[in-house]
């Protein structure tokens, strides 16, 4: 379509103040967001006779309208720009795809505080330690904390309703503050303080405190207690000796980038309280013909300005590249943090060594990603050749999971040229069908998925159905009956039947519900891609089915007991801390739950035991 945007008329009325601009295509979709110190000067650069960037040329051809928002300062413009990028996800902007909040270790503010993994806005009262690069690092640290400092990690509902210590106490991983007489409040508070000091990086103070207590116990002839504290000191020392301690006191993020013109890897190394907390590699979505300067400028802005409320900002940010808006960016991040944050680009000494480490890891991560992308690209090309298709932008796959027809769940997974799009995975609880009728289940999920308006970008090129001719026939019937405003004939429907022994490599592809299928060679890249998407769909369906089955299982055994309605079921599970705790409880313990008489407690006890 010919571009009808009147750039000359638009530029004649644009202000020269700082601000943010949004560019729209003919469909009204925001395709690019930018900021400028001088809006008129910046926007004029897009419409010059000679444009240096091929990306800019492609962008300008798509422009149908431009909106501008004037701001008081460049800092305001920067913050607004990244807010718009996050909201609209424009296709010509560099996008940070992994925008999950970082996990923290949370120490609650209860009388007997608990340790837990936490992700999200910090609304709950307590202390937060981190951020950690991933949930695995948090789980490993929590497991270590249990061995070093045995404070509780159980949910409050379990803690409030214990009448005797749990298994964690028996194996020395908890002091059992839930039951009176096992640990004093003072002793528990002391262990909590050790946790606080240890997670804050003050290992020496922890060891000094433990040594003092060990000596006091020894002098008082409490040799068993002294030996236990001695073992705790040894365990803490073993851990701290293995940790790499940096020669810095403040929090520091070290960032390097590796870029090959198509794929960018931004590697972030986190230092907290002078220790290497971990690292993380990011692969932002980079539009074609994007410069390295734009990649790093946009990444840093999105990384620190978006979601800053749930991220602990460092005192200093060390970069392996020059940043055009370094001063403005530092001011913006500092205003959010409420304290001065420095951005450095030319370090010396130890900091230069950390930057070299980040640079090496960025290059390694990029090389690994390139190999993965090459494999994915090879598989896509093989599949396109097999199906005689010019391009495949989007594929979806469906699977059904149930146990003897109960708690049926259907899954839909989505793949694009880069592999799985996990943010677009969906599960569907299936109801109103004959138990075990997989055809009816497939009919229902496909109707729910496609029997509505779809954006053009959401229409799949291929839909894989996990099943043979019957399931494929069901899918074809559904699509023939659809009454929708998009081209329902566009998706290619393919049935994927497992081999006789359900072994990988023996799959048969069906393109029609009648006739013979096609069996690909076991070393076919196209087959490997199909197996990948089919296995993902299967995994996603089974996980959803197990969750649904577990939810039903947790209440079904109570539903059959006369006199126990929904409110009493909820009350029992809440006060006892779950179904397993209720099963383990005595009649007397069950009778302590509000509204539960002794007679009803006996009935519940007998029903759960038998």
Swiss-Prot record:
Q: Which domain of life is it from?
A: Bacteria
Record's CDD domains?
GIY-YIG_UvrC_Cho
Domain GIY-YIG, first and last residues per copy: 16-94
Q: Name one GO cellular component term.
A: excinuclease repair complex
**What are the residue boundaries of the UVR domain, all occurrences included?**
204-239
* Matching PROSITE patterns: GIY_YIG, UVR, UVRC
Which GO BP terms apply?
A: nucleotide-excision repair; SOS response
Q: Which GO terms describe its molecular function?
A: DNA binding; excinuclease ABC activity
Q: Where in the cell is it found?
A: Cytoplasm
**Is Transcription found in the keyword set?**
no
Q: Cite the entry's keywords alphabetically.
A: Cytoplasm, DNA damage, DNA excision, DNA repair, Excision nuclease, SOS response
Q: Which InterPro entries match?
A: GIY-YIG_endonuc, GIY-YIG_endonuc_sf, GIY-YIG_UvrC_Cho, Hlx-hairpin-Hlx_DNA-bd_motif, RuvA_2-like, UVR_dom, UVR_dom_sf, UvrABC_protein_C
Major localisation: cytoplasm
The UniProt entry, under NCBIfam families, shows:
PRK00558.1-5, uvrC
What family is it from? Belongs to the UvrC family.
| PANTHER family xrefs | UVRABC SYSTEM PROTEIN C, UVRC/OXIDOREDUCTASE
Q: How does it assemble?
A: Interacts with UvrB in an incision complex.
Q: What does this protein do?
A: The UvrABC repair system catalyzes the recognition and processing of DNA lesions. UvrC both incises the 5' and 3' sides of the lesion. The N-terminal half is responsible for the 3' incision and the C-terminal half is responsible for the 5' incision.
What is the protein's given name? Answer: UvrABC system protein C
Say which species the protein is native to: Proteus mirabilis (strain HI4320)
What is this organism's lineage? Answer: Bacteria, Pseudomonadati, Pseudomonadota, Gammaproteobacteria, Enterobacterales
- Gene field: uvrC
